[in-house]
């Protein structure tokens, strides 16, 4: 599946549901309590993070999309903490505050990255469903997708009113369902149960074929547009009417904590759909996002750069021939990992041993080597009629096959100055017997603090000489 990064800045999403505060107490554990056989934790740090529907909205904002949130809280310190965190993250939160009930808080006691205890402070909210529906309807014209983030805590009382209001405006409705009655989500564009939630409704599935059959039946019964079953280490399965099932393998490299993974899936889906992605592509992006977030500790959001890097890995753009946009993203990823970027350029019309030795020496100047290649028209201007011998596509393909070369990109100008201004390498390398100041682009690189290095030429290695020898023998 071909994936690309959507324009999340053009993706307004409204999230409605059960907001909660995820509170973490971190501390050291070195002894057992004399009062009971339990560890004593000396609390050294505490942090609050938005949870539930608030985490969905936070994830949407972290991707660079516009997140609006409607939910229910108490009128207390936890609600204030939630509101402040969401505002700082760029989420437009509208809370229905209830004096008589506390904000839902999930307190986790942590030591050495392990969860020792979770304490829940909650009671189901007695929501003013009519007032909440009015708040939602007032915002629907501002968004492209509606998300129902349902944790069964009472914020969502009349799902059908919200679903029908969105459908009347041709706004897709995504629901993360809970409970034993999925009929309340009838008419939704997509629901995203995990496997356990799905099997609670349809019964145990012995294999994928049975999962698909039961899923298709559920879609028809509830008039759903699509169904996405998240299956942990087995990935995800997307079902659509009249289409074959789409099975996506899990993409997690390491799994530390699955807390909030479902929130990440539906938030990425919503943001991608709001940005104009087709459903299969949006699911592919959500699958990558889930693989990232389970590698983090606790309730966490992923950023657009993190997802962008995952897309690059998925599309194999860690190495090889890249367009300029892809290259700039790959450089951003490399710099995020502290890697030094080296750049060199040339025509590389007929690759020979001298080129290979030179490129290996250039690669040794840093961590990543970019080779800028003159396109065919510029080679003709520089070398004369009859050149290049090989087209730019072939020249770049050969260079990309060398172990020393990370990325290859072409440029149309006679010199690489314009490309250097965009790439901004840490080190500019050229081969020759001249001084640093004579290197084309040296002033550009040195102006922003980069280095320029000149490597010696390999003797008896010249493309021009090779071409002349071929012509003499031809």
Curated annotation (Swiss-Prot):
Pathway: Nucleotide-sugar biosynthesis; ADP-L-glycero-beta-D-manno-heptose biosynthesis; ADP-L-glycero-beta-D-manno-heptose from D-glycero-beta-D-manno-heptose 7-phosphate: step 1/4; Nucleotide-sugar biosynthesis; ADP-L-glycero-beta-D-manno-heptose biosynthesis; ADP-L-glycero-beta-D-manno-heptose from D-glycero-beta-D-manno-heptose 7-phosphate: step 3/4. This is Bifunctional protein HldE. ATP binds at residues 194-197. Catalyzes the ADP transfer from ATP to D-glycero-beta-D-manno-heptose 1-phosphate, yielding ADP-D-glycero-beta-D-manno-heptose. It comes from Pseudomonas paraeruginosa (strain DSM 24068 / PA7). The keyword Kinase applies. Its EC number is 2.7.1.167, 2.7.7.70. NCBIfam families: cyt_tran_rel (TIGR00125), PRK11316.1 (NF008454), rfaE_dom_I (TIGR02198), rfaE_dom_II (TIGR02199). GO terms for molecular function: ATP binding; heptose 7-phosphate kinase activity; heptose-1-phosphate adenylyltransferase activity; phosphotransferase activity, alcohol group as acceptor. Pfam families: CTP_transf_like, PfkB. Residues 1-318 are annotated as: Ribokinase. In the N-terminal section; belongs to the carbohydrate kinase PfkB family. In the C-terminal section; belongs to the cytidylyltransferase family. Homodimer. GO terms for biological process: ADP-L-glycero-beta-D-manno-heptose biosynthetic process. Residues 343-474 are annotated as: Cytidylyltransferase. GO terms for cellular component: cytosol. It is an enzyme of class 2 (transferase). Signal peptide: none annotated.
